[in-house]
Structures are given as structure tokens and as C-alpha cells.
Amino acid sequence: MSTNKKTKIVATLGPACSTREVLKDMIEAGVNVFRVNFSHADYSDVKAKIDLIRGLNDEFGYTAAILGDLQGPKLRVGVMNEEVIVNPGDIITFQTAEDVPGTKERVYMNYKEFPNDVNPGENILLDDGKLMFEVISTNRTTEVVAKVIQGGPLKSKKGVNLPNTKVSLPALTEKDIRDAIFAIEQKVDWIALSFVRTAEDLMELQDLIAKHSDHKIPIIAKIEKPEGVENIDSIITHCDGLMVARGDLGVEVPAHEVPLIQKKLVHKAKTARIPVIIATQMMETMITSLTPTRAEVNDVANSVMDGADAVMLSGETSVGNYPVQVIQKMTQIIEAVEDSPLIQVPQNTPQIKTNRYITKTICQHAAQMANAIKAKAICTLTNSGYTAFQISAWRPQADILVFTSNKRILTQLNLIWGVKTFYYDKFVSTDDTIDDVNRIATEKGLVTKGDMLINLAAMPIANKGMVNTLRVTEIE
């Protein structure tokens, strides 16, 4: 691959990137993870694209990962009868009993408990907050009467946000359960859950994965509701990664509060040593233009400097005119800023004496020693991928080279900052294995004569136990 960036790029699949040639060009330009958006997914189409990506991985030695993104409990209005414009002061009834074409006076809502959950005075937001209504009354069964506060075109199937309402929807809808089972069958590398409000939401998905998969599939919690922000500490203990989903979050909370929430969530994720993805509207103008705005360039750069593991593109790659060029531009921005000394890493050392304490401590010191001796790379042998997460979290200047015989984590770890993975299944004595992976790193041009290299391994190596050994080598 032509890029040596450490921050990863997640690109959403869609009609704009449906050919093998475009997917290959996107990987070459810097895509590390492809996202399947199950809000707009046809199973046969998704399976075909996943097969194409895995075919490219096999043929060219790529490690592109697949992220399945579940829609979650998304509220929507029904189909409108005609072009409807609502004006401030208009009165409109939302009904849940019957899905009839909508008019200026009455519109269907796909959420049966809506009349029971809302209260007078609460807001209803439509179409990413473009329209705002205030609840006047509810009959608690099938109808809610609301007044238009902010008007405009009321369009079919547009999303609904209820920022002041505690919704009683399940975290996993029936559609999500079907989509998750399909994603598990496709052996996706990561599953993201939308609108996570509590740790219990994640436990439901964990139980579903355990029931249908022989392997653990790591879960990313998408934070896009105020409750998710409030409960972030308990959510972090039950997920494997975070996504700051700024689209719905910027509707559910005032948009001007999102920048500080983003920084807070990134800091929490880094402190917990789990990966974090920044998503939504990063290069939005590049859907139709070859040039991003200065504000978009700054947004990508600032997200990298906040410490994001990955930045994500949605419409830019799924339906945009320039799916390859937007990746090239994003890679350019990342490479320009990610080595900045202004990027801060939380220096909280492992304190709690868990059974992973030794591994955590060795990974921390490997990263710090690599910076001190200006090592070119940190090589680790891993079966679970745990050491890769831990080393990456300390953001060493050295490359993180992961050698594993576990084919599932070859692609899974491609989301993690700074990590490059290689298949390796010749585990002999510790000394011989370390010499062997160092030779491979040299052959691949990742280190050269005179470079310092740090190796992490478990002794005895055949047991594939927890890392307990750190060795420094000068490449000869």
C-alpha cells in the first residue's frame, strides 16, 4: 500500500463503490475498513461486495476489514401524499395506528409507543432537525397533537428525533436482529450498534452474537443520544470500541455542544484503551465536489489530533461522485498532522492488578521505550489481538507490527491505530521466532539495517499465553 498513515479510514459501501476496480483503488488510497450500513442494505448486494473485498485481500495481501453497522431503533414518519409544507403555528397530528399517506394535518409515525412516551412540552425533530414541533397533547394510545415551531418541507420517510423523551424502544429491533444474524454469518470483523443508551443495550447484542457465533465479534457502541453521553462510563466497560456519530447526536443535543462531547468521548475511549471512530459529515462537500472546504479539512485534522483511531466517510463513498479521490484527500490530511507533538495521550498507567496486568504494563513500557530509543517498529506475536489494542493505545511513534496465526484478527485489527498485521504460523522457540519475524519485517522493508526494533512475546511461545517478555534488537 502506498500510504504509511497510522490513523485508519472507514469507508461506507454503496452504489458509488460497487465494482472491484473502485474497491481496489480505495484500498490503495488508504481505506482500512469498509462499513455496511444496514439502514440501506440488500443482503445479496452486501454479500457480493464482502466477497469482492475478501477476494482482493486474498489476491493482493490486503487486510481490509468489514464493519456491520446496525440501524438501531430509528424513528421515521410515513409516506407523504404530496409535497407538504408546514409553517410555524400549524397544528399536526402524528398517528401510530394506521399507515396512511400523510397530509398537512395528519402524518403516520412508525413507533407504536410514541403517544405513551411523549409528554406535552417535549420537542419532535424531523429530517435532521430541519423541522421542529412541540407536543401539545397525547391520547396515550394512538395520537399525538403537535404545533409547528420551525417549518419547511415535510418529506416522506424522514427520520424523527425525540431529544427530551425517554423512548421505550428496544436497543435491537426485529430488523436489527435479522441484520446482526446475517452479519455474523458473513463473519464480519466488527458490529456497530446505533443509538446505544445503556450498557444493557450492548449486553443484548453480546448475547445474540454468543448464540450465533463461535467467535467473539467485537462491538462498537455508537453514541448519538444524550443518554449515551450520560452513561458513557458504564457503556465503555461493555463495548470494544466507540463511534462518535455526530449526525444524530447533533440533532439530539444542540449542535454547538457536539465538539466538546466529541473531545470528551475520545478522551474516555483513549483512557479505557479502546478504539474510537469519528463519523458524519467529515468531507460532505466531496459528495459532489473534488475540493473539500477548509472547515472540513480542519475537522478531519482536529479529529486526528484529538486522538481518533479512525475517521469515517458515509455518503462521500457510498453515493458520492469521487469515492477514490475523497480517500486520497483524507489520507493526505491524516499524514500531514498525525505526527504532531500537540497530540496528547492519557498517561494513566495500569493500576488494577487484573490477570492482564503484566501484559498491559509490558505494552505500556514497550511504547514508551520505543519512543525513548527511537525504535522503528514494535513487533508482537498475538493470538487474541489484545496486545495490539494495548500498544496502540499508547500511540508510539514506531510502527506496530502484529504477527498472528489467527486469521480472524488479521482483518479485525485493521481498525486499530498504527497496527499492521501479518499471517505467521511458525511458532518454534522464542529466540528463533523473534529472529524470524524480524527477518520478515526487514524483507518487507519495514525496518532496515541499524534500526532498533522491540519484540514482545509470551514464553514459552508454544503455549500462546499472555505476553511476558520484551526484547530490544538492532537490525543487522
Q: Which ranges hold each PLM region?
A:
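Non-catalytic helical/linker scaffolds that mediate oligomerization, partner binding
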Residues: M1-E476
